[in-house]
Each structure stands twice: as C-alpha cells, then as structure tokens.
C-alpha cells in the first residue's frame, strides 16, 4: 500500500516548509527503524515542497492511520514543529492517488513555477538517497522510476518545459529592472549543490561573465573547476561579497550562511556605497532577513519570488495532465497485475507439477516418448495461457481478489494474498485523497 504525506506551497507556509526541510534527511531512516510495517520510505524535499512516500506492507485495517501517525510523530520530532501543526500542514494521499500525485509533481505541474525542470532531478535524487540509506522498496522503486519516465514524456510531448522555467530564472526576471548591464554584473554564487549548476546556467544565459563561487562546506574548488569559474575560500568571503553586485545563494546548509554583519563588512571593505541584490534560493533559508537593515542591500527570497510566479500555459498544462493521468492509470493496472501474480504462479506450478507426475508414471511403464512428452507440455502450456491472461485482465478491472479466491477454491492451493488486494474497511484520515480520487 502506497501512502504520501505532502506539504507544499499549496497548503503550508514557507516558515513551516523551511523547518520541514531541516528534518528531511533523518525522516526515512527513523521511520524504517521504528516501524516494522513500513517496508520503504522516500522523502522528497525541495524549495517549495516536503513529501514522505511510504510503502506499507501491514495488512491490518488500521495500517494507513498507523503509518500517518508514525510519520507525523517522526517529522515533529525532527523538525521541532508541534505535532498538531505538522498534522495540519500535510495532505494525505493513499493508493492510486499517490502515483498520479508524484507523476504530476515530477512533471512540474505542482511547482510554484509550473513546468520548471529542476523538480525531475530532485525526484530522481530523492530515490537515489533512499537507495543509499537502504530505505527504498520494490514498490517505491517502480513508483519513482515511472515518475521519471512520465516527466520525460511530458517534456518531449508538450511545451510545458520548453521555456526553461525555474525559480532561479523567475528570480532573475524579477531582478531585470535592477540590472543595467548583465555582462558587467559581478555575481557571487553561494552553494555548490544540485541547484548551483542551474543557477550558473541561468546567469550565463543572461550574459553574466563574472561569477565566483563560495561553499560553506568547503566544496567550492570541486565545483569551480569543471564550471570554469574562480572559487572563494572562507577567509576571502567578505572581499568577494564586497566585489559583488549580486549574490545568489543555493546552499543546503541547515542554517543561514549570510547575515547583516556579513553585508556590513562587505560595505566597509568596498567603501563605494554600491547597491547589492541578494537572491536567496535556499530552503531552509541561506540568508538572514536582517540583511535588509544594511543600507543598499535588497533581498529576494523564495516567498517573495513565489508571489510573482507566472500564469500557467493552459494548453500545455492540459496536455501534460493527460499524459500524467494515462501514466497513472497504466501504473495502477500494472500494480494490479502484480497482485494476482502469486495466484497465477501457484496455478501454473500446480498444473505443471501434475503433468510431470503423470509423465513420470508413464515413463515407468515404458509408454513414453520424447515427442509425446513435448506435445503434452505444449498442450498444458496452451491450456494454462488463457486463465493466466484472464487473471491479469480481471486484476486490471479491480477483480484481483476474486482471482485469488477462485484459484484457492478450485485447486485447493494456498495462495498468500498481498495486502494491496484486500479490501479493508476505510480508516478516517484528515484531508485525505483516497484511491481513485483526483490528486
């Protein structure tokens, strides 16, 4: 059973999202350690989203409620947000709704800047992180891999991502009126994570040629070399700030790396009274809001940038939604087929075991030949093929439980029924998207 707890710019404040992002690294591992019924967990944390995807294998009726409560407890403990506030900040999606939601997220349909391309890479890295941490599962692997495939389909078959939309490009759009000449603008890039490359590319597309990079974690040289830009050491940070007209921060540091005293120091070093624009793309925030108390400093943070998100392209969005819906339907069908697989395997194994037993008795009587055995095996394969195909068809129609019941009743086979095939009594959950409902 797949479950997703999601908090985003749609239903949570940036203050809450900032605290949740701090909790992200530890949530999946803690959930797995503390709850045997959770088979897998993947956490996706971006600049406007925190989501926990769970694979719950416990067949109990209350499994969904237990998984939600366990996740809320872990997130509350890791983030410092009161439990009730965490509960009030997340939507819960179960079953079929999970796939459609993630496919839409990975395609950029749920982003602040609809169609932005960075989210696909963030979804991919979330799965890679779960693999590294040993918290993924077969079900989550398929879910996230299908999400990546769906995102690629949206990118190639619609115009949704053709404009190169992203938060950093939107931020630079907003900065346009403050920049007289991009080619003469000196920029300090703070951070070397996944978003740093996109930020550098966006700056270069504007014509920026003077970019230095500083890393709070000391990885500036590693980033600077391949990208052909100078690295800034910690001891030279104030000097680099002083020489900059614009600062773009995209670090994954858990606390602010720039504050008012840094900007005051930079102003003192430069001594020219220049204006500086600081663009903070970090979550949690990389820049203390108190920088605006320094004369000449202007701050664009994620919350401000989000207020200026462009209207979506309705035609491209509708086309993308159609692709997502189709992919989600196919994912549901494939998952349903998997649910009857044990019954189909048990049936085929039973019938072929019976055949082998009969052939063995015939051999002992000396009445067998290679041609006869080959013909009988072919006949049994033909006879088993139709029920196998029909079982998958019924599963796609939501009749998987009937298939399992029939195999057990007619052949006396003990088929272990996967939890996902069962039909437990619905458990009341707050703000929940049940299977089959729109995400």
From Swiss-Prot:
* EC class name: oxidoreductase
UniProt comment concerning the protein's domains: Possesses an unusual extended V-shaped dimeric structure with each monomer consisting of three distinct domains arranged along a curved 'spinal' alpha-helix. The N-terminal catalytic domain specifically recognizes the glutamate moiety of the substrate. The second domain is the NADPH-binding domain, and the third C-terminal domain is responsible for dimerization.
Origin organism of this chain?
A: Clavibacter sepedonicus
**UniProt GO MF annotations:** glutamyl-tRNA reductase activity; NADP binding
Q: Which residues does the annotation say bind NADP(+)?
A: 191-196
State the remark under miscellaneous.
Answer: During catalysis, the active site Cys acts as a nucleophile attacking the alpha-carbonyl group of tRNA-bound glutamate with the formation of a thioester intermediate between enzyme and glutamate, and the concomitant release of tRNA(Glu). The thioester intermediate is finally reduced by direct hydride transfer from NADPH, to form the product GSA.
**Positions contributing to substrate binding:** 46-49, 111, 116-118, 122
| Sequence similarity | Belongs to the glutamyl-tRNA reductase family.
InterPro entries in UniProt: 4pyrrol_synth_GluRdtase, 4pyrrol_synth_GluRdtase_dimer, 4pyrrol_synth_GluRdtase_N, GluRdtase_CS, GluRdtase_dimer_dom_sf, GluRdtase_N_sf, NAD(P)-bd_dom_sf, Shikm_DH/Glu-tRNA_Rdtase
Q: Tell me where on the tree of life, at the top rank, the source sits.
A: Bacteria
> Cell cycle as a keyword?
no
The lineage is: Bacteria, Bacillati, Actinomycetota, Actinomycetes, Micrococcales
Question: What is the protein name given in its UniProt record?
Answer: Glutamyl-tRNA reductase
What's a single GO BP term from this record?
protoporphyrinogen IX biosynthetic process from glutamate
The record's subunit annotation is: Homodimer.
Kindly tell me the pathway this chain contributes to. Answer: Porphyrin-containing compound metabolism; protoporphyrin-IX biosynthesis; 5-aminolevulinate from L-glutamyl-tRNA(Glu): step 1/2
């Amino acid at each position: 059973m797949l479950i997703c707890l999601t908090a985003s710019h749609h239903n949570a404040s940036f203050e809450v999202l900032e605290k949740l992002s701090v909790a992200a690294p530890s949530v999946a591992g803690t959930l797995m350690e503390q709850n045997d019924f959770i088979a897998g967990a993947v956490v996706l944390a971006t600049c406007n989203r925190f989501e926990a995807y769970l694979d719950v294998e416990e067949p109990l009726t209350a499994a969904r409620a237990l998984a939600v409560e366990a996740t809320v407890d872990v997130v509350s403990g890791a983030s410092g947000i009161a439990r009730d506030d965490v509960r009030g900040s997340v939507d819960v999606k179960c079953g079929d709704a999970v796939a459609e939601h993630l496919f839409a997220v990975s395609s950029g349909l749920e982003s602040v800047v609809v169609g932005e391309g960075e989210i696909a890479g963030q979804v991919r890295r979330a799965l890679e992180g779960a693999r590294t941490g040993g918290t993924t599962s077969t079900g989550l692997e398929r879910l996230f891999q299908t999400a990546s495939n769906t995102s690629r389909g949206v990118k190639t078959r619609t115009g949704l991502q053709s404009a190169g939309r992203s938060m950093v490009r939107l931020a630079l759009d907003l900065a346009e009126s403050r920049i007289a000449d991009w080619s003469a603008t000196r920029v300090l890039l703070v951070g070397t994570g996944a978003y740093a490359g996109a930020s550098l590319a966006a700056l270069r597309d504007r014509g920026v040629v003077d970019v230095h990079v500083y890393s709070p974690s000391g990885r500036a040289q590693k980033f600077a070399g391949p990208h052909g830009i100078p690295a800034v050491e910690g001891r030279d940070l104030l000097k680099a700030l002083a020489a900059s007209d614009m600062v773009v921060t995209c670090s994954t540091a858990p606390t602010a790396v720039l504050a008012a005293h840094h900007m005051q120091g930079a102003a003192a070093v430069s001594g020219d009274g220049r204006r500086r624009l600081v663009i903070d793309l970090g979550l949690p925030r990389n820049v203390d809001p108190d920088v605006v108390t320094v004369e000449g400093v202007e701050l664009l943070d994620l919350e401000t940038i989000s207020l200026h998100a462009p209207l979506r392209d309705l035609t491209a969005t509708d086309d993308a939604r159609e692709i997502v819906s189709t992919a989600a339907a196919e994912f549901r069908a494939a998952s349903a087929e998997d649910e009857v697989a044990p019954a189909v395997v048990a049936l085929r194994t039973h019938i072929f075991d019976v055949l082998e037993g009969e052939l063995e008795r015939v051999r002992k009587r000396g009445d067998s030949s290679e041609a006869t055995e080959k013909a009988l095996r072919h006949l049994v394969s033909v006879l088993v093929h139709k029920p196998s195909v029909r079982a998958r068809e019924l599963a796609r129609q939501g009749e998987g439980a009937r298939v399992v019941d029939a195999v057990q009743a007619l052949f006396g086979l003990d088929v272990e029924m996967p939890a996902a095939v069962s039909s437990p009594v619905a458990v009341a959950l707050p703000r929940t998207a049940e299977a089959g409902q729109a995400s």
